[in-house]
């Protein structure tokens, strides 16, 4: 894991591992330091680096800018230089055939998220996921990458872990499984159902459970669940084997007005099955009309919506995970 006592270097490393397009490089005085260069190489570019390496195309782009910045920072070449390890790593990447940008966007790659709010002792809490960084996959699903609302809801739960600790959780629209892994690995939930309406997304969840050491855990259960479809079939007496659900989580599941009626129908059925259940939704306000449509639909079906005071931190304030700060993300508790 990222091991650097310098905040600038650590921040750069965590941003890189999250495959951020805009990186906060350490200042020149640090970059020209031999020890800092070696730390960056060992943490990010060495074949035996402690986290899975990002795609070759991304590594090469960052290495080019990094070495250029180091070169610009050097005032005395008798005293400082560019690490041979960094130059060798770049030369190897230059010699490799690389996929096109379009091809690279569809490939699944490792993305590591640093959980700064859970920092403690020598442990560097993090979640590594296999993701497709394109906005929409070739199959049409949006669930193969982690969206900002999941990261923001994860931060909210990290400082309010009592909401899920020792609880049985159902996540709607789990996507890459970020929240499910967070709850099961770090927040002390007793069980998480990681549900999604896409069969492809549910099938790929096993990869991300494996990467995070949860492949043999009975704390996470992937499930295909389509909103608006009856939870109880004609041959079932109890849904989910009659096991209770305490909390429902959903991040970025109100993205389109067309899905809202089916979502509300599923929430109604869950409330009927589990009276008193807690429902926590994180909604990204890309379009004010869509968000207001969701609020109106909740009101018509008897749900009260209580917004939480948990604004998106500015980019400068973020220490990991990193996400856009220009669009509001509303965290709401629903009750009926």
UniProtKB/Swiss-Prot annotation:
Biological processes per GO annotation: methylation
Molecular function as annotated in GO: S-adenosylmethionine-dependent methyltransferase activity
Superkingdom field: Eukaryota
Location, primary (coarse class): cytoplasm
Residues engaged in binding S-adenosyl-L-methionine: 147, 173-175, 196, 232, 251
EC number of this enzyme: 2.1.1.-
UniProt KW keywords: Cytoplasm, Methyltransferase, S-adenosyl-L-methionine, Transferase
Enzyme class name: transferase
A GO CC annotation given for this chain: cytoplasm
Alphabetized InterPro entries for the sequence: Methyltransf_16, SAM-dependent_MTases_sf
Places the protein is found: Cytoplasm
Main function: S-adenosyl-L-methionine-dependent protein-lysine N-methyltransferase that methylates elongation factor 2.
Family recorded in the similarity comment: Belongs to the class I-like SAM-binding methyltransferase superfamily. EEF2KMT family.
Protein name as it appears in the record: Protein-lysine N-methyltransferase EFM3
């Amino acid at each position: 894991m990222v091991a650097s006592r310098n905040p600038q270097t650590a921040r750069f490393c965590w941003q890189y591992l999250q495959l951020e397009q805009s990186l906060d490089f350490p200042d020149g005085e640090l970059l020209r330091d031999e020890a800092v260069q070696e730390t960056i190489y060992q943490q990010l570019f060495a074949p035996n680096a402690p986290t899975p390496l990002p795609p070759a195309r991304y590594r090469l782009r960052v290495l080019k800018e990094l070495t250029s910045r180091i070169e610009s920072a050097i005032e005395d070449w008798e005293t400082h230089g560019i690490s041979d390890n960094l130059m060798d790593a770049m030369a190897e990447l230059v010699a490799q055939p690389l996929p096109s940008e379009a091809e690279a966007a569809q490939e699944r790659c490792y993305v590591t998220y640093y959980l700064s709010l859970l920092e403690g002792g020598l442990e560097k809490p993090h979640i590594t996921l296999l993701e497709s960084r394109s906005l929409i996959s070739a199959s049409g699903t949006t669930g193969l990458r982690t969206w900002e609302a999941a990261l923001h809801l994860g931060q909210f739960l990290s400082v309010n872990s009592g909401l899920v600790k020792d609880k049985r959780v159902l996540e709607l629209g789990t996507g890459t499984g970020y929240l499910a892994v967070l709850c099961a690995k770090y927040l002390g939930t007793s069980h998480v159902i990681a549900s999604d309406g896409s069969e492809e997304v549910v099938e790929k969840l096993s990869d991300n459970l494996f990467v995070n050491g949860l492949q043999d855990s009975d704390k996470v259960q992937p499930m295909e669940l389509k909103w608006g479809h009856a939870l109880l079939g004609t041959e079932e007496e109890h849904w989910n084997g009659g096991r209770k659900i305490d909390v429902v989580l959903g991040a970025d599941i109100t993205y389109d007005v067309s899905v809202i009626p089916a979502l509300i129908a599923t929430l109604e059925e869950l409330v009927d099955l589990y009276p008193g259940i807690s429902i926590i939704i994180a909604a990204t306000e890309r379009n004010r009309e869509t968000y207001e449509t969701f609020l109106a639909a909740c009101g018509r079906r008897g749900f009260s919506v209580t917004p939480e005071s948990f604004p998106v931190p500015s980019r400068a304030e973020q220490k990991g995970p990193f996400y856009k700060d220009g669009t509001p993300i509303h965290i709401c508790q629903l009750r009926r």
